[in-house]
């Protein structure tokens, strides 16, 4: 299995637009042959610190956003060929609308499963 993880920083005035776009992109990707799973995650919590994790404390809900909201894409597919083919289609279809919503370039991590 091949995976892409993207970290996005969205403009505060574009949150509704980007979340609607995420639904469109996920639906589009899931219809493509070789795509296994697509998840978009909105950062809503943080840990107080490492000791809080060791003590089993609950994460802290974020109550305000300063300048941006962070989202993560987890996208799983059969192999690199699927990634190349579907990624190209996605960029052709969604790039301009997507880019208008972001504060900075997307951070992208690509790789294969270990477990």
What are these model-predicted stretches?
Residues 1-2, 64-68:
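Short, flexible turn/loop "capping" segments at secondary-structure junctions
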Residues 2-9, 72-74:
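Active-site-flanking beta-strand signature of metal-NTP-handling nucleotidyl enzymes
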Residues 10, 22, 42-44, 77, ...:
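Short beta-strand segments enriched in hydrophobic/aromatic residues
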Residues 16-19, 71, 78-89:
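Short amphipathic alpha-helices within nucleic acid-binding modules
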Residues 22, 86-87, 95-98:
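Short, flexible helix/strand-to-coil boundary loops that buttress conserved ligand/catalytic motifs
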Residues 22-25, 29:
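Hydrophobic alpha-helical core bundles mediating ligand binding, dimerization, or RNAP-core interactions
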Residues 31-34:
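Glycine-centered tight turns that cap/initiate beta-strands
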Residues 36-66, 92-115:
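Glycine-rich beta-strand-turn "strand-cap" elements at beta-sheet edges
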């Amino acid at each position: 299995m091949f995976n892409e993880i993207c970290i996005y920083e969205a403009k505060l005035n574009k949150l509704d637009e980007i979340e609607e776009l995420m639904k469109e992109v996920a639906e589009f990707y899931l219809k493509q042959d070789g795509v296994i799973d697509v998840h978009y995650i909105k950062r809503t919590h943080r840990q107080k610190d490492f000791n809080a994790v060791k003590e089993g404390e609950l994460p802290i809900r974020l109550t305000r956003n300063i300048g941006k909201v962070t989202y993560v894409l987890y996208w799983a597919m059969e192999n690199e060929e699927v990634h190349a083919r579907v990624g190209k289609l996605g960029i052709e279809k969604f790039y301009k609308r997507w880019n208008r919503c972001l504060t900075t370039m997307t951070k992208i991590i690509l790789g294969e499963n270990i477990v």
